[in-house]
Design a protein with these regions (language model features):
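Short, ordered loop/turn segments at secondary-structure junctions
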Residues: 69-71, 79, 108-109, 134-137, ...
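General beta-strand structural signal in soluble alpha/beta enzymes
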Residues: 105, 131-134, 155-158, 189, ...
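Solvent-exposed alpha-helices and their adjacent loops that cap or buttress functional pockets
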Residues: 12, 55-60, 96-97, 122-124, ...
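Adenosine-phosphate binding glycine-rich loop
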Residues: 158, 282-390
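N-terminal ligand-binding/catalytic initiation module
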Residues: 1-155, 375, 381, 385, ...
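Rossmann-like adenosine-cofactor binding region
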Residues: 232-301, 307-309
């Protein structure tokens, strides 16, 4: 199937993948008076007395904003906010289909960090959470941090944290397959953008001790010249042995390679230098750092990619609907590391021992157990940490 042509036909035909649904009858004068004036004044007055009542008297409790500036849309790059709308609508469809979360796309005509932060912060009272989407690094870090400081609802950059959660879930199960412990492995990450940074932080929280990040200039280590503030911060908590050199040097002896970088970056020769039963997560899209067959031929035991046409797809849709479902259910103020760890472990646990194998380390996106498993784990973690409001 030619997905490009068929998708374009679909979008011309439906003219938008979302619409508003009405949840109350408006088929009589009495019904109209309850849904709108004069009756609607009473819930307004209740919310005026206590703004938290907006969660009980409006759809705020179940509504998320999907926010972009169009600067890093898929592999298309900076295409602008209007051009990003089909992706944002698609994201909203996934929220509803896989998490029963109502989501609204907000495409902002500005690349200025403060413009975006101010716009979203001023609208935050209408939503139970905000999903930041396809915003270029390093601005995405600053936007998320500033927004979370100003808002008392979850601000979640899915390109960072959703990727990290699914990566960790896959790694938990891949390590079971090869019989290794997370605290014993050497792990190399290629790519120090939004996803790479978030994956690094979550894997460190999960127990990885020997983790080396690589960017275009090679291994990141303390004292390396030209590091931006984010990379300098990561240099202080990664690469404990201070390894230097390019990817081809530092990958020697590694148990795990995680790629969130560029096509073809990992060669068969590099895989051959890795430890026995190596794990490869090659997630550059649409072309991975190395093709699965090539990685396996070079000795890799478990290979995952971001593509649906290969086994072991690392796909954010496995986690973000459930994470928001859980956060919204308990009115969490933010999404913490413990909530993300809980989501990853819940996702990994859905693949039982009998099904677990080299080509089956993650559940399928259409597995109906995912929403409840992930959301309940996230809600429980939020309550345990004191982040929940109900």
């Amino acid at each position: 199937m030619n997905y490009a042509e068929k998708s374009l036909e679909l979008h011309y035909e439906v003219k938008g993948k979302l619409e508003t649904a009405v949840r109350v009858p408006v088929d009589s004068r009495e019904a109209l008076s309850l849904a709108y004036t004069p009756g609607v004044a009473q819930p307004c007055l209740e919310i005026q007395k206590d703004t938290d009542k907006s969660y009980e008297l409006t759809r705020r409790w179940n509504t998320v904003a999907v926010v972009t500036d169009g600067t890093a849309v898929l592999g298309l790059g900076d295409i602008g906010p209007e051009a990003g709308m089909p992706v944002m609508e698609g994201k909203c469809v996934l929220f509803k289909a896989f998490g029963d979360v109502d989501a609204i796309p907000l495409c902002i005509r500005s690349k200025n960090v403060d413009d975006i932060v101010n716009t979203v912060a001023l609208l935050a009272g209408s939503f139970g959470g905000v999903n930041l989407e396809d915003i270029s690094a390093p601005r995405c870090f600053e936007i998320e941090e500033k927004l979370q400081a100003r808002c008392d609802i979850p601000i979640f950059h899915d390109d960072q944290h959703g990727t990290a959660v699914v990566m960790l879930a896959g790694l938990i199960n891949a390590l079971k397959v090869v019989g290794k412990r997370i605290e014993d492995i050497k792990l190399v990450i290629s790519g120090a953008g939004a996803a790479g940074v978030a994956v690094t932080k979550l894997l460190l929280s999960a127990g990885v001790k020997n983790l080396i990040m690589c960017d275009r200039k090679g291994a990141i280590y303390e004292g390396r010249e030209g590091l931006n503030p984010v990379k300098a911060q990561l240099a202080a908590i990664t690469n404990p042995k201070g390894e230097k050199g390019g990817l081809s040097q530092v990958i020697a002896g590694a148990d795990v390679f995680i790629g969130v970088s560029a096509p073809g970056l990992l060669t068969a020769g590099m895989v051959e230098t890795m430890a026995k039963d190596a794990i490869i997560f090659a997630c550059a899209n649409p072309t991975p750092e190395i093709m699965p067959d090539e990685a396996k031929a070079a000795g890799a035991a478990v290979v995952a990619t971001g593509r649906s046409d290969f086994p072991n797809q690392i796909n954010n849709v496995l986690c973000f609907p459930g994470i928001f479902r859980g956060a919204l259910d308990v009115r969490a103020r933010y999404i913490s590391h413990s909530m993300k760890l809980a989501a990853a472990h819940a996702l990994a646990a859905l693949v039982d021992e009998a099904e677990l194998g080299r080509e089956n380390i993650l559940p399928q996106a259409f597995d109906k157990r995912i929403k409840d498993a992930v959301s309940q784990a996230v809600a429980r973690a939020a309550r345990d940490e004191g982040i929940a409001r109900v």
